[in-house]
Amino acid sequence: MKRSTVVIRPSARALSRQASSQSFLLARSSALTSRQRRLYSTHPPNARLNLPIDYATTPLLAHTSQAALSNPELPASVRNGTTKRMNLFQAINDALSTALAEDESVLIFGEDVAFGGVFRCTTKLAETYGGDRVFNTPLTEQGIMGFAIGAAAEGMRPVAEIQFADYVFPAFDQLVNEAAKFRYRDGAGGRSAGGLTVRMPCGGVGHGALYHSQSPEALFTHIPGLKVIIPRGPVQAKGLLLAAIRSNDPCVVMEPKILYRAAVEQVPTTAYELPLGKAEILKEGKDVTVVSYGQPLYKCMAALKAAEQDFGVSVELIDLRTIYPWDKETVFNSVRKTGRCVVVHEAMVNAGVGAEVAAAIQEDPETFVRLEAPVARIAGWSIPTPLVFEQFNLPDVTSKCYLTLGLADVYADGMPRDIRRHQKGDEFLRDLSMNSGILKQSMLHSSRRGVDWLMGIVLDDIILSVFLV
């Protein structure tokens, strides 16, 4: 039997409406000014985003065996050993394999973990150590966390993987009211979830949008009883993850997913730990302290090099590594020396890690009296991560740094024309004063349009405090 085809044609009335609508939109578009038409654009305005990061040459990674083994935090037995070139996910895989080999109480599980995981961090672990120690779970974060807490309470050392940090929220009740409080509830002689480690990828990648690019680390820093760790590279990832697994406190290890393949360095092949709760001074300076963690450190380093070259500003860069509990002593000592501090992170600015660091600095009398300028928080907008404009929702170090300094010619609507060297002295201050009003209006205008190109981590406060205070 032959099948008949029914063709539905639009009525004359519908066609008339469509033509009228198109005519109206065309007339409306032609009546708009070029500035108004930008509201309808699907493309963000031209902006000088962050200076390009060359992961192959950045000083934040150990590109040679000598550099990797010269780390003073490594034990002597490791410093006399060998290294292997690894990216971040390979270093995590190596740490997990080491933990499984050394301790039979270690279990690893999560969604697609037996398969190797979305980012391949658990590749071949199930084949090597067996499906009873490395296995998949149903798609239930609350169930994953509950199982992990129960296993830890029975003396195991479970490593639970949450596929994306964005997915952890159904498990939040388990983390807050069970994992973190177990020890307080049962007392010193009771059981605890101290052997628990939770891994999760976090941060933006350029196309993750609302449910795959969030940075919720500050939420975990409000939970007494947890340790929260964010590595910046493979050497750190291996050492900090092993320390977390061996720790007797429940730990949350948040891994910047954009670094899984981008960050590559020489990693010691033997087992080692890096200290939890201890920051690392990546670069010493005398004019201002920049405190950050994870992927934004690379953007900071690129911008700081440019700032030092153009203006002679000496910047001290600190990697927190553990954001809760964080290393107050290292940060305070640095700020007492420089008199200025900027805290940088990708997560939204409100109630973030930057707020805690800034408050702690001004609450410490010995540090506060040495401040030459207010502590600056430089972070993300308090908005969901957009898909099309995600790169503009991530930290833009260079653009806003140069703009706020008055180093860029500006269009009438506040967009940068070009970047140039700027004279110092009275002319510099005069131009800076004139441009500041334009830039403030530009920022408000950009925010209203939803084109958030003046985003996030910026080093304007660094240079302003150095030149103007």
From Swiss-Prot:
Q: Which CDD domains match?
A: TPP_PYR_E1-PDHc-beta_like
Record keywords: Metal-binding, Mitochondrion, Oxidoreductase, Potassium, Transit peptide
Q: Which reactions are catalysed by this chain?
A: N(6)-[(R)-lipoyl]-L-lysyl-[protein] + 3-methyl-2-oxobutanoate + H(+) = N(6)-[(R)-S(8)-2-methylpropanoyldihydrolipoyl]-L-lysyl-[protein] + CO2
Cofactor needs: thiamine diphosphate
Any one Gene Ontology MF annotation carried by this entry is: 3-methyl-2-oxobutanoate dehydrogenase (2-methylpropanoyl-transferring) activity
Locate the residues binding K(+): 194, 196-197
Q: Which SMART domains match?
A: Transket_pyr (SM00861)
**Listed InterPro entries:** THDP-binding (IPR029061), Transketo_C/PFOR_II (IPR009014), Transketolase-like_Pyr-bd (IPR005475), Transketolase_C (IPR033248)
Which residues take part in binding thiamine diphosphate?
A: 167
List, alphabetically, the GO terms of the cellular component aspect: mitochondrial matrix
**Which compartments does it reside in?**
Mitochondrion matrix
**Transit peptide range?**
1-40
Task: Look up keyword Transit peptide and say if it applies.
Answer: yes
Might you give the EC number(s) for this enzyme?
Answer: 1.2.4.4
Main EC class the enzyme belongs to:
oxidoreductase
Any one Gene Ontology BP term: response to nutrient
> Which Pfam families does the record cross-reference, listed alphabetically?
Transket_pyr, Transketolase_C
Highest taxon of the source? Eukaryota
What is the documented function of this protein? Answer: The branched-chain alpha-keto dehydrogenase complex catalyzes the overall conversion of alpha-keto acids to acyl-CoA and CO(2). It contains multiple copies of three enzymatic components: branched-chain alpha-keto acid decarboxylase (E1), lipoamide acyltransferase (E2) and lipoamide dehydrogenase (E3).
User: Subunit notes for this chain?
Assistant: Heterotetramer of 2 alpha and 2 beta chains.
Q: What is this protein called?
A: 2-oxoisovalerate dehydrogenase subunit beta, mitochondrial
Q: What is the lineage of its organism?
A: Eukaryota, Fungi, Dikarya, Ascomycota, Pezizomycotina
